């Protein structure tokens, strides 16, 4: 259910253009450059802010969110025999939804990466059906858990050598096997937990160094990072936070707070990570580009609605990604329909799910109040891992700024040889010709919008 104040728009009638003033393709492409001022400013501000949060023990606390309303969820009957594996399946799903909501002018349709890929191409192939007639289809990227996972996955691939060394040194070779080199969605929760304790440890280690003589201020992040690069091991620690871990944390927190335009800045930042050969996020890079297209190209009143609905107010405590409700439903079906499994039993379960889930959410509201409401009460204690990793960094890199910044190009952390992640990003983002950032952006966005949109 959408609050009335978000429904006052006039651009979504059949035959009426849902787009605003034409975008400049050059200006659009420039948003993804490594030097883009908005992206750089956010990274630098975030670095300082997150180190200060680490200092006061609030780094992993959920944002304090004012949720204006709680979404009312209606769960439709399951669509049997279709997935996202083919365009025909996704088109059938769209048609079922359009038929059930033919009195609507707009359908914002969420999904995981594969669903969004299919929808983007269906809009390209059949604009007369999905854009020029109602209900208009606007794809909404599922940003938590899927978006968070893929942002993490791209950076994890770049920093896997550091992660491996940190896990082995902190946990011991046998226990460290739980921290995998190539995470999948199935092990997302355990791997992001590992990322969080490494993030805390690296943050607290940099804070320790910053309080010793000669250290630059953390309020000057560019100078701070440049000094860290004198020692390759300290550079690994600093860039792990600056380019990767803080991006993942920032992304997750912004979805929780429904800060839509800030999420767009983070997708633009992700481009530099996902576009590298090591990260190889060949599906999520084009999807990130299209996410920004929809955020920028819509008519102002429709864009206002789009940004307000970026994340779903699932409870009084927090917003979630558009992919979260269906993930919860899938998990509930798996747990709740264990015996005599049949189509009829699953349909009955889905029909009753809203009441069960609403009751569960109400219980969580109570528990959140009892535990103080910062979200960390649900997380396994990580203090021993954090302390052990900090000890490793102190022993191998140095206990003060002067020691840690002695020029050194040979790792003492046991990190395997290879191109440094931050160097690979710079090289990837400075390619000439057809592989340049502007050419890549233009190629993707023009191809996927050529039947219904024209850039300046």
Stretches with model-predicted labels:
Residues 1-456:
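Buried hydrophobic core signal strongest for RNase H-like alpha/beta domains in large
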């Amino acid at each position: 259910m959408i609050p009335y104040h978000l429904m006052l728009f006039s651009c979504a009638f059949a035959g009426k253009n849902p787009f605003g003033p034409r975008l400049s393709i050059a200006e659009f492409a420039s948003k993804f450059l490594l030097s883009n001022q908005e992206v750089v400013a956010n990274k630098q501000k975030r670095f300082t802010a997150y180190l200060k949060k680490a200092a006061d023990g609030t780094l992993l606390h959920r944002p304090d969110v004012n949720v204006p309303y709680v979404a009312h969820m209606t769960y439709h009957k399951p669509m049997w025999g279709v997935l996202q594996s083919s365009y025909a399946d996704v088109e059938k799903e769209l048609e079922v939804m359009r038929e059930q909501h033919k009195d609507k002018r707009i359908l914002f349709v969420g999904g995981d990466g594969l669903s969004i890929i299919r929808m983007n191409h269906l809009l390209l192939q059949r604009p007369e059906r999905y854009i020029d007639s109602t209900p208009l289809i606007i794809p909404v990227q599922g940003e938590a858990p899927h978006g968070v996972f893929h942002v993490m996955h791209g950076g994890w691939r770049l920093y896997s050598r550091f992660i491996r060394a940190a896990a082995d040194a902190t946990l011991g070779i046998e226990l460290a096997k739980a921290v995998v080199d190539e995470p999948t969605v199935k092990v997302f929760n355990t791997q992001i937990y590992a990322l969080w304790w490494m993030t805390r440890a690296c943050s607290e280690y940099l804070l320790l160094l910053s309080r010793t003589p000669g250290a630059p201020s953390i309020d000057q992040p560019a100078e701070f990072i440049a000094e860290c690069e004198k020692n390759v091991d300290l550079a690994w620690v600093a860039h792990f936070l600056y380019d990767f871990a803080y991006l993942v944390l920032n992304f997750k927190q912004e979805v929780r707070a429904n800060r839509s335009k800030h999420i767009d800045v983070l997708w633009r930042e992700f481009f530099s990570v996902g576009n590298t050969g090591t990260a190889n996020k060949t599906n999520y890079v084009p999807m990130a580009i299209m996410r920004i297209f929809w955020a920028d190209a819509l008519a102002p009143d429709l864009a206002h609605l789009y940004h307000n609905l970026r994340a779903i107010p699932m409870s009084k405590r927090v917003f979630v990604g558009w992919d979260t409700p269906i993930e919860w439903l899938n998990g509930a079906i798996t747990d709740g329909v264990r015996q005599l499994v049949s189509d009829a039993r699953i349909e009955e379960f889905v029909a009753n799910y809203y009441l069960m889930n609403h009751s569960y959410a109400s219980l969580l509201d109570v528990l959140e109040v009892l535990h103080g409401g910062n979200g960390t009460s649900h997380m396994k204690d990580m203090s021993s891992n954090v302390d052990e990793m900090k000890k490793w960094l102190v022993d191998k890199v140095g206990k003060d700024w002067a020691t840690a910044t002695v020029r050194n190009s040979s790792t003492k952390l046991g990190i395997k040889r290879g191109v440094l992640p931050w160097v690979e990003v710079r090289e990837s983002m400075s390619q000439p010709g057809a592989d340049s950032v502007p050419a890549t952006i233009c190629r993707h966005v023009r191809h996927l919008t050529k039947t219904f949109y024209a850039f300046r």
